[in-house]
Curated annotation (Swiss-Prot):
InterPro entries: MAGE, MAGE_N, MAGE_WH1, MAGE_WH2, MHD_dom
Protein name: Melanoma-associated antigen 3
Residues annotated as domain MAGE: 109-308
Quaternary structure (record): Interacts with TRIM28.
Listed result of changing D170A: Abolishes HLA-A1 binding
GO molecular function terms noted in the UniProt entry: caspase binding; histone deacetylase binding
Composition-biased stretches (Low complexity): 21-44
Residue segments, region Disordered: 1-99
Keyword Ubl conjugation among record annotations: yes
Biased composition range(s): Polar residues: 65-87
Tissue expr: Expressed in many tumors of several types, such as melanoma, head and neck squamous cell carcinoma, lung carcinoma and breast carcinoma, but not in normal tissues except for testes and placenta. Never expressed in kidney tumors, Leukemias and lymphomas.
Top-level taxonomy: Eukaryota, Metazoa, Chordata, Craniata, Vertebrata
PROSITE patterns: MAGE
Amino acid sequence: MPLEQRSQHCKPEEGLEARGEALGLVGAQAPATEEQEAASSSSTLVEVTLGEVPAAESPDPPQSPQGASSLPTTMNYPLWSQSYEDSSNQEEEGPSTFPDLESEFQAALSRKVAELVHFLLLKYRAREPVTKAEMLGSVVGNWQYFFPVIFSKASSSLQLVFGIELMEVDPIGHLYIFATCLGLSYDGLLGDNQIMPKAGLLIIVLAIIAREGDCAPEEKIWEELSVLEVFEGREDSILGDPKKLLTQHFVQENYLEYRQVPGSDPACYEFLWGPRALVETSYVKVLHHMVKISGGPHISYPPLHEWVLREGEE
């Protein structure tokens, strides 16, 4: 029996192991909707990996909203790929190699979360609202029973990785609009070559500085960002040149200040909040936001490289 058919007989909370510690999203808060309330019994998140999907398992990509610029559409789900390969081997070798159903279910659920994140990013790029009906029809399909869980995880991932939140403006029609987290007036999509929102990284850097006090040494910033697989001097598929983004772009946008530590020899540098950040938000709001979406007092971040949407044809 296909996994999609078998999964309809499972409960959302069954078979989901705690992965929030790895993702830093246990207890993450999605928009206060009936979907999130229904999913509250399952507070863990399933790890999602984006990259290239094996051709044999490539799903039909969600239809791009009208007016949306092209986003990369190919995705990769190693767990799903492994489950698929194991299933193929089982057909040849017999039931002894049948994959663990729990692992296969987790991987398939992760796939749906990733597909919904991708669909919502397309909607955000097009500056269009989104309805529950669109999400069900374009992405979720016969996984409708698991929609509360899928929606909650996708919403939390948008907040932490991309700095975007969904706000329900019509509870009856289940209509949602997008907003930048913390009410920031910047999302990182300014410019012709900006295909991914970067407010998530900005908020993380602001949180690191706030946690350190009034300023944070540059080496501390890169130490923290290394948890996201974001490194100084290494080109990133989402961020481009991270060093340039932090020391030039965010500085030019007046969200960060980058200065030499007085009296340092050899020269050392540090980051401070810029005037625009001080006007639009506060230390308390930023730290509260990070604690809320990471599910505890210790801020941890999912690897951004696992959320990369690589170049592909729309």
